[in-house]
Amino acid sequence: MIQLSAELLGRGYAPKINDFRTAAIPDLTEVIIERRWLQNHFLNTIFISFETSSYDPIRARFVICAFRAQAALVAYDRAKASCEAFFDTFIDGNPVVDLYFDAVAQWEGVVLHLHHVVDIFKRANGNDYSKSNVEKRLGDVANRIKHVAEYIPTSAHQGLTIPMWLAHDGVETSKATVTFTEIADLLVALAKHLDKWQDPIALLKAEWP
């Protein structure tokens, strides 16, 4: 079996692909269960009387955030499973590329869905999330993914094959890193808030911590 150098694999496939052999990815099994945030919120609004027009923007924020949170949790579960499959089949100098890129795609989904949620509530509350280190870095990673077409022909891309890659402690770009633990913590916090926010009265007072 041919074994390729880490440098060649990194240049041809993805940075650090041959170094990605283990990862500390928190288990969110207890969080990744069937959630009924959307259904519960819908039913709760039926029995509460308030000015519909003034609640419409709040409702929109909740629906978008709830479905993206659900999507992020599903993607997180799949990303963790893909990483574990990649590690189980790992061969130094000859990694299973398809499994690696499946994991990358799932982690990109987690980042993008989670960033949408953070951005919506920060803007709604008029908060400056640039002052929050984790959320700022999450935004930097998300923007690299979304705007990769703009970076490819520029020096900012630095000859990279993909905008985001995987390291043993988290996801990385040329600009920022967010650890798997930080991502898990944000998802856990979001799930707890949505558990409360499915009640419209609580949602009216909602603020991102």
Segments from the language model and where they lie:
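Interfacial non-cytosolic loop connecting adjacent transmembrane helices
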Residues: 154-166
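Amphipathic alpha-helical interface segments
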Residues: 1-137, 164-209
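Histidine-centered, metal-coordinating catalytic motifs and their short helical/loop contexts
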Residues: 132-157
